[in-house]
UniProtKB/Swiss-Prot annotation:
Residues 174-261 form the PPIase FKBP-type domain. The gene is tig. It catalyses: [protein]-peptidylproline (omega=180) = [protein]-peptidylproline (omega=0). The lineage of its organism: Bacteria, Bacillati, Cyanobacteriota, Cyanophyceae, Synechococcales. It is found in: Cytoplasm. Its main location: cytoplasm. Involved in protein export. Acts as a chaperone by maintaining the newly synthesized protein in an open conformation. Functions as a peptidyl-prolyl cis-trans isomerase. This is Trigger factor. GO terms for biological process: 'de novo' cotranslational protein folding; cell division; chaperone-mediated protein folding; protein transport; protein unfolding.
Amino acid sequence: MAKEALIVKTTPLPQSRISFELEIPSETCKTCLNETISSISRSAKIPGFRVGKIPKQVLIQRIGITQLHASALEKIIDKSWQEALKIKSIEPLSEPELVDGFESVLANFSPEKPLKVTLQTDVAPELKLKKSKGLSVEISKTKFDPKSIDEALQKSRSQFANIIPVTNRAARLGDIAVVSFKGKYKDSDKEIDGGTSESMDLELEKNKMIPGFVEGIVKMKIGDTKTLNLKFPEDYSHEDSRGKEAIFEVNLKDLKEKELPELNDDFAKQSGNKESLKELKKDIEKQLKDNFEKTQKDIKIEALLDALTNELVAEIPKSMIDIEVRNNIEQTAQRFAQQGLDVKSTFTPELVKSLAESTRPQAEKNVQRNLALKALAETENIKVEKDEIDLKMKDYEDAISQSSKQIDIKKLTEVISNDLLKEKLIIWLEENSEVKENTTKTSKTTKNSKTTKATKTTKTTKTTKTSKTQNKKEKK
């Protein structure tokens, strides 16, 4: 007599879910139940019987048929689930959900009859781009500000300044104030979490602390105490404090100022290991311009990726977002551990919940963007060849050979492959999209006008493989 086969019927559901209706043969149910009883029998201890020699009926009486059925049912469902996935060649994204619930299935379970269950799981969504070529984006183009070079020099001077005590004047912007303070909410008189300090060195610069805090210390003298009535910004990092009014009692305990070094060749040698101030300025200018160009390029790429994502048609399952959120939290925990913090005590259930909520919007955006790039690779048949991966792997040979830790080569290869593919996709987007760069020039404000007149200039950049070829021909 032929062995009864598992019957599997699948039905697509919204949000990239799929339903599996399984009819499991009674033969499978009986086999799994007997295996469960045998397994428990080998380890169970019942007075009067040797381990592994307990009769089946005694075991059923002692443990109970319901408990044995429950253990067997878990095995039956898991085994049948794995077999169903192979039959249908489906890779699930999430653990299967038993639609009727385990208790309900258990109550109706009989090993003498075929078992019918319905399971649901998330699967990878079907991806489609409404459009891939000819995307059009508009970005704001800014010019490099030469003043940033002097600002960087002043920041460097500040870092190498001598700190000297101040005794004969009031506090002013640029000083270092040693303060103690205690804050409470105005409406509830409750102390602000993290709003108290016995002694803190505070550089009196605008935008430090909440609005009005630094300004309130300016003009205070050592020994002065002052009450500051302030308000937390609506976008403050701690949600509980947003928009709330607060009262801070501040005491100025000590005051210091920075004695800035002269801008000369000696300073260049001290701060940047350069032979002259002229050489230091050139080096700073190069770094700032490189960073500026990178930022401009990043802005363009972000705009192109957003435009591509807007063209994506896909029903994204919740589990994909959940996985991304979990990965983000794990990465945060790893950074905490690298900083020497105790992850177990730091990552309380409340913090994990807060992180999950705050990072979810960005996680959703990341998933959408990654799927859009995947869809682009499939639509335009963009791939990474093995020789490209091998060539890139050579850059890591020294690091791999010198590392004291075991390197997962397979995982490294996967990361390199993904990075190379993303680079190719972004280059393709740049070559096949239209970027409009808007530059705004502002005229001087006159006495008779309250508003500033602005002229808007639009520059369109469209780089395609065809245009590149044409340019080469024209040059020839």
